[in-house]
From Swiss-Prot:
An example molecular function term from Gene Ontology annotations: DNA-directed RNA polymerase activity
A GO term from the CC aspect: DNA-directed RNA polymerase complex
Gene name for this UniProt entry: rpoY
Assigned protein family: Belongs to the RNA polymerase subunit epsilon family.
Naturally occurring in which organism (per UniProt): Lysinibacillus sphaericus (strain C3-41)
Assembly and interaction partners: RNAP is composed of a core of 2 alpha, a beta and a beta' subunit. The core is associated with a delta subunit, and at least one of epsilon or omega. When a sigma factor is associated with the core the holoenzyme is formed, which can initiate transcription.
Keywords: DNA-directed RNA polymerase, Nucleotidyltransferase, Transcription, Transferase
Pfam families for the chain: RpoY (PF07288)
Lineage: Bacteria, Bacillati, Bacillota, Bacilli, Bacillales
EC number: 2.7.7.6
Keyword Transmembrane: no
Record-given protein name: DNA-directed RNA polymerase subunit epsilon
Length: 69
């Protein structure tokens, strides 16, 4: 399954919506996504499962790149 992760790069700073970034990651569950990213200093705001039409829409975006972890 493919997940879209919304995050702030520095977990020690106050989250600001304009600084929110996203990445795409393949994993079996949301828990696995969080475990894969735990060594990074990210403030994870939201993990969203992509499927169906929404996945197709995201894959059509030039910003769609699966992270390799």
């Amino acid at each position: 399954m493919i997940y879209k992760v919304y995050y702030q790069e520095n977990a020690n700073e106050i989250p600001v919506r304009e600084n929110t970034k996203s990445l795409y990651l393949e994993a079996a569950s949301e828990r696995e996504v969080r475990q894969k990213l735990k060594d990074r200093n990210y403030n994870i705001e939201f993990v969203q499962l992509l499927e169906g039409n929404y996945l197709e829409y995201e894959q059509a975006s030039p910003n769609f790149v699966l992270e390799e972890i």
